[in-house]
C-alpha cells in the first residue's frame, strides 16, 4: 500500500458518552498544547475524555477535566493529570465557538483524541444537552433502524 493511500489518523481516546448525552451541532479539529510525558501517556492509551469540556477564557480555549494518567517513566516531569490544557485554534474559530456558547444550553465537548501526522489532535463539538426523553427517543430510533437492517439482510439472502 502506498503512503498516499494510508490513513494517518489513529484514534487514541473517544468520548462515546458525548454522542449519547448531547445533540452534536458542529465539530472541528483543534491542536492541543501538551508536555512530552503527556504525549507519551496518550500514545500508550492512558487518557480519558469522559467528563471533559471546553471553556473560553480571555480569548483562549481550554479543555478541562481531561484526565491523562502520569507517564510511568516520567518521574519529575509528570504534570497534574487533570490540569487545564490549551487548545490551538485560530481567533475566528474561537469567536465562532464563543457565539455558540453564548446561547443558552450550548457547550463545547471533546469527541475524540487522535494522531494526525504525529501530532495529537482533538475533535471538538459544539453540542446541546439532551433531556431524558430525547435519549429514550434516540435509543428507540436506533433499535428500529437495527431491526429494519436485520430484516432487509434476511430478505435478500
From Swiss-Prot:
<dbReference type="Pfam" id="PF01668">
    <property type="entry name" value="SmpB"/>
</dbReference>
<dbReference type="InterPro" id="IPR020081">
    <property type="entry name" value="SsrA-bd_prot_CS"/>
</dbReference>
<comment type="function">
    <text>Required for rescue of stalled ribosomes mediated by trans-translation. Binds to transfer-messenger RNA (tmRNA), required for stable association of tmRNA with ribosomes. tmRNA and SmpB together mimic tRNA shape, replacing the anticodon stem-loop with SmpB. tmRNA is encoded by the ssrA gene; the 2 termini fold to resemble tRNA(Ala) and it encodes a 'tag peptide', a short internal open reading frame. During trans-translation Ala-aminoacylated tmRNA acts like a tRNA, entering the A-site of stalled ribosomes, displacing the stalled mRNA.</text>
</comment>
<dbReference type="GO" id="GO:0005829">
    <property type="term" value="C:cytosol"/>
</dbReference>
<keyword id="KW-0694">RNA-binding</keyword>
<dbReference type="InterPro" id="IPR023620">
    <property type="entry name" value="SmpB"/>
</dbReference>
<keyword id="KW-0963">Cytoplasm</keyword>
<comment type="similarity">
    <text>Belongs to the SmpB family.</text>
</comment>
<dbReference type="GO" id="GO:0003723">
    <property type="term" value="F:RNA binding"/>
</dbReference>
<protein>
    <recommendedName>
        <fullName>SsrA-binding protein</fullName>
    </recommendedName>
</protein>
<dbReference type="InterPro" id="IPR000037">
    <property type="entry name" value="SsrA-bd_prot"/>
</dbReference>
<dbReference type="GO" id="GO:0070929">
    <property type="term" value="P:trans-translation"/>
</dbReference>
Amino acid at each position: 500500500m502506498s503512503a498516499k493511500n494510508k490513513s494517518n489518523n489513529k484514534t487514541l481516546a473517544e468520548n462515546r458518552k458525548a454522542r449519547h448525552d448531547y445533540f452534536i451541532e458542529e465539530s472541528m479539529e483543534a491542536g492541543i498544547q501538551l508536555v512530552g510525558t503527556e504525549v507519551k501517556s496518550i500514545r500508550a492509551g492512558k487518557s480519558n475524555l469522559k467528563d471533559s469540556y471546553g471553556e473560553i477564557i480571555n480569548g483562549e480555549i481550554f479543555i478541562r477535566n481531561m484526565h491523562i494518567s502520569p507517564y510511568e517513566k516520567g518521574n519529575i516531569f509528570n504534570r497534574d493529570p487533570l490540569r487545564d490544557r490549551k487548545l490551538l485554534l485560530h481567533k475566528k474559530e474561537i469567536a465562532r465557538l464563543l457565539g455558540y456558547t453564548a446561547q443558552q444550553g450550548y457547550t463545547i465537548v471533546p469527541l475524540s483524541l487522535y494522531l494526525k501526522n504525529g501530532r495529537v489532535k482533538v475533535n471538538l463539538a459544539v453540542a446541546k444537552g439532551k433531556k431524558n426523553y430525547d435519549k429514550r427517543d434516540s435509543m428507540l430510533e436506533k433499535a428500529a433502524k437495527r431491526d429494519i437492517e436485520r430484516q432487509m439482510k434476511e430478505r435478500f439472502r
